[in-house]
Amino acid sequence: GFGRLGSHFWGFEMSGVIPDIITLGKSIGNGHPLSVVITKKNIADVFNNGMEYFNSFGGNPVSCEIGQAVLGVIKEEKLQENASSVGNYLLDGLKNIQNKYNIIGDVRGRGLFIGIELIEDMDNLVPAVDEAEIVVNAMKDKGILISLDGPDHNVLKIKPPLVFNKKNADYFLESFEAVLLKSF
């Protein structure tokens, strides 16, 4: 969400559906503890039955202003467009690296949400679980935090901040290729 995919502000928009209820957390507050529930009026009206919901921080004007400010920065600084252009640049760079290293079975993603699937054997698509852990730790040693995902924990998950730029992408690509060259 929040434009990370570049092409869409919300991930569900890619599927052409509108959910009945949407929950937001963490990113909307940019470090400030804030979460949001968004729903359709007919669903919200069901809760208007005389029972009062109370929360000490519900509707806090400071929190609401922070959420509005975060959305404003995303729009004003064109961070969704940045996610698209820098994400495409990073994806292209990763696909070029994929052509050099058999351990990379697939590179996929959209915007600044990218996965790199590591495999031991291209013919049998055996997940490279131990190797994925090695890459995550080696990237951490270079000051880059990525994580593992997928049912076999062999997919490197790359979700940099929305302000990630081409210079950051170049550093990531150089570091990633150096790790692969040294480790495999």
Describe the residue ranges of each PLM region:
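Conserved N-terminal phosphate-binding loop of PLP-dependent enzymes in the Aspartate aminotransferase
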Residues: 1-184
